[in-house]
Amino acid sequence: MKLSARNVLEGKVLSLKKGPVSTEVDIETKGGERVVASITTASADSLKLEVGKKVYAVIKASNVMVGTDE
């Protein structure tokens, strides 16, 4: 797999929260960090995502969102 993005984190799916339009994917990276991504449910289905499946979190600086619990 070749990508232009420089930040590619290998990991596994910890959990999926599927909705009618979007799915929240909780990923644990090889380094032990957790990344949560929101993707379309159609994409989650197309990728056949399931808990424990090996995945890659691809992060481009222009597409990162930051939030707080406050």
Question: Where does each model-flagged region fall?
Answer:
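Non-catalytic connector elements of ABC transporters
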Residues: 1-70
